[in-house]
């Protein structure tokens, strides 16, 4: 019994450590990629080819003094970055690699619940700073995330109808012979754009509009708390791209030994697309952002959901439960 508990704790810690290392080097990849796109080198001084830059950045942030605004709410100000990172890491629990930490029947719904909870961390961090710029950034972020969760939820339901359930292991079995991307590419395109908005990435980075809001909801955070918020943001980016790969480009279980490498290679390709988008597109206006969702994506996703449901029922094609 004790050995099983120790094994589970060790597995969880190794899982978390692997994610955090991946996130650290994702920041380096972003800086390098943006550097080359702007005809410069990017980080190249710390370690060979700048490979130790994320470690140096992390050490610098940890050793700095964390300042708190005098009029801030101290408890929420301290708790919100911790909560943000905990939620971002907890979302990975049902993800098969190829075996998940917890094989949930409703894994996708759990992920949506964690994503919804993340809005509280953002709202707390903006409100507890007791400053107008973080509060405006937090309000924008919450409005944006809640709005785009509508589309993400409808797409998840549509994909669950095609695969036969909300378990991510089912998606692996469904895509043994053919990716779901081929049969539902309009949903995949809308999903990719919605994940950009959900993770507050360019061109939907209205929460961090540098020219308007200084840095958004994390303006007043420095040192360790800022590092936690930063890690949470990039953990979410990596997670959303892993989820996209699981739902639309799943490697299947034909080669379980190569499953993780296959999955993470596709995830890195999608993440590179995120970074490429950041380098290429200007920021959307707020009204354009909302218009895109409520007047274009919502009717389309509803139509695709009804099509998938009616087709499955008409052809008796709903997979057995």
From Swiss-Prot:
<dbReference type="InterPro" id="IPR001694">
    <property type="entry name" value="NADH_UbQ_OxRdtase_su1/FPO"/>
</dbReference>
<dbReference type="InterPro" id="IPR018086">
    <property type="entry name" value="NADH_UbQ_OxRdtase_su1_CS"/>
</dbReference>
<protein>
    <recommendedName>
        <fullName>NADH-ubiquinone oxidoreductase chain 1</fullName>
        <ecNumber>7.1.1.2</ecNumber>
    </recommendedName>
</protein>
<keyword id="KW-0472">Membrane</keyword>
<keyword id="KW-0520">NAD</keyword>
<dbReference type="GO" id="GO:0008137">
    <property type="term" value="F:NADH dehydrogenase (ubiquinone) activity"/>
</dbReference>
<keyword id="KW-0830">Ubiquinone</keyword>
<keyword id="KW-0496">Mitochondrion</keyword>
<keyword id="KW-1278">Translocase</keyword>
<feature type="transmembrane region" description="Helical">
    <location>
        <begin position="177"/>
        <end position="197"/>
    </location>
</feature>
<feature type="transmembrane region" description="Helical">
    <location>
        <begin position="9"/>
        <end position="29"/>
    </location>
</feature>
<dbReference type="GO" id="GO:0009060">
    <property type="term" value="P:aerobic respiration"/>
</dbReference>
<keyword id="KW-0249">Electron transport</keyword>
<feature type="transmembrane region" description="Helical">
    <location>
        <begin position="297"/>
        <end position="317"/>
    </location>
</feature>
<feature type="transmembrane region" description="Helical">
    <location>
        <begin position="219"/>
        <end position="239"/>
    </location>
</feature>
<comment type="function">
    <text>Core subunit of the mitochondrial membrane respiratory chain NADH dehydrogenase (Complex I) that is believed to belong to the minimal assembly required for catalysis. Complex I functions in the transfer of electrons from NADH to the respiratory chain. The immediate electron acceptor for the enzyme is believed to be ubiquinone.</text>
</comment>
<keyword id="KW-0679">Respiratory chain</keyword>
<keyword id="KW-0812">Transmembrane</keyword>
<feature type="transmembrane region" description="Helical">
    <location>
        <begin position="106"/>
        <end position="126"/>
    </location>
</feature>
<keyword id="KW-1133">Transmembrane helix</keyword>
<keyword id="KW-0813">Transport</keyword>
<dbReference type="Pfam" id="PF00146">
    <property type="entry name" value="NADHdh"/>
</dbReference>
<feature type="transmembrane region" description="Helical">
    <location>
        <begin position="75"/>
        <end position="95"/>
    </location>
</feature>
<feature type="transmembrane region" description="Helical">
    <location>
        <begin position="151"/>
        <end position="171"/>
    </location>
</feature>
<feature type="transmembrane region" description="Helical">
    <location>
        <begin position="256"/>
        <end position="276"/>
    </location>
</feature>
<dbReference type="GO" id="GO:0005743">
    <property type="term" value="C:mitochondrial inner membrane"/>
</dbReference>
<comment type="similarity">
    <text>Belongs to the complex I subunit 1 family.</text>
</comment>
<keyword id="KW-0999">Mitochondrion inner membrane</keyword>
